[in-house]
């Protein structure tokens, strides 16, 4: 199944506070597989170079524990329990064993822009025997560039967004408004897909990029039926996160 042949991707799995299901957890991943929707997860490296499924740099928000994930060994990370529910942090390999190719998987590689040692070969090693539909993506173009140089067989994409001044000092207002620096990098890297922020999904420079490269467009994070409509208008596949029954019904209807 190609990455664009799905109604949507559950952002960090199907998680909800109502049932004590935490983002990026094994339960959230299982629920998405059972619902038949694609899954978007976050991955970063342990200190011993094992890809772990977790979003934040530090453990505290989701576990109540102190510590930075990239400074910990995988075995220690896997023993950490989330603050709610019964799940522990899992590895990418655990996630692949849960999904088993039943639905497409988008793997966002977190670099946190910290200049940590390269992680790309570890990702390639874990994914080399996985036959299920999946793609690797990152905000950090240097990660995608290194994956390409290492010959990663996985589809590779960029995560892009609006360019607020505080995050993009030193660029012109035109560059900030258009997002052209990101899109130029996407062209240079010849990416296989792009995931762009829903609030900027109708950016004409983005439309031109998609038209020229003829690649799938995903949009994050869709949290309402109005946002879903905006994504649909641009033929963007939603990366969604919601307890909105109406939105889930719309996604089911489109499948």
Where do the model's predicted regions map?
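Phosphate-group recognition and catalysis centered on beta-loop-alpha active-site segments
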Residues: 1-255
């Amino acid at each position: 199944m190609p990455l664009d042949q799905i109604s949507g991707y559950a952002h960090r799995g199907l998680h909800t506070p109502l049932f004590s299901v935490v983002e990026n957890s094994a339960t959230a991943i299982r629920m998405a597989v059972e619902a038949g929707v694609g899954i978007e997860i976050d991955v970063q490296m342990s200190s011993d170079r094992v890809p772990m499924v977790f979003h934040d740099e530090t453990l505290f928000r989701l576990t109540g524990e102190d510590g930075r994930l990239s400074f910990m060994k995988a075995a220690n990370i896997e023993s950490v329990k989330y603050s709610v529910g019964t799940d522990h942090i899992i590895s990418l390999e655990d996630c692949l064993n849960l999904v088993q190719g039943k639905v497409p998987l988008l793997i966002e590689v977190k670099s946190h822009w910290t200049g940590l040692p390269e992680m790309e070969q570890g990702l390639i090693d874990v994914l080399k025997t996985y036959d299920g539909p999946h793609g690797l993506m990152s905000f950090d173009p240097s990660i995608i560039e290194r994956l390409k140089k290492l010959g990663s067989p996985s589809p590779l994409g960029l995560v892009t967004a609006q360019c607020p001044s505080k995050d993009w000092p030193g660029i012109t207002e035109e560059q900030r408004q258009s997002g052209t620096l990101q899109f130029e990098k996407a062209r240079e890297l010849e990416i296989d897909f792009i995931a762009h922020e829903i609030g900027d999904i109708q950016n004409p420079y983005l439309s031109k990029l998609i038209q020229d490269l003829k690649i799938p467009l995903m949009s994050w994070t869709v949290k309402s039926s109005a946002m879903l409509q905006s994504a649909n208008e641009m033929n963007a596949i939603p990366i969604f996160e919601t307890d909105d029954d109406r939105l889930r019904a719309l996604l089911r209807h489109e499948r």
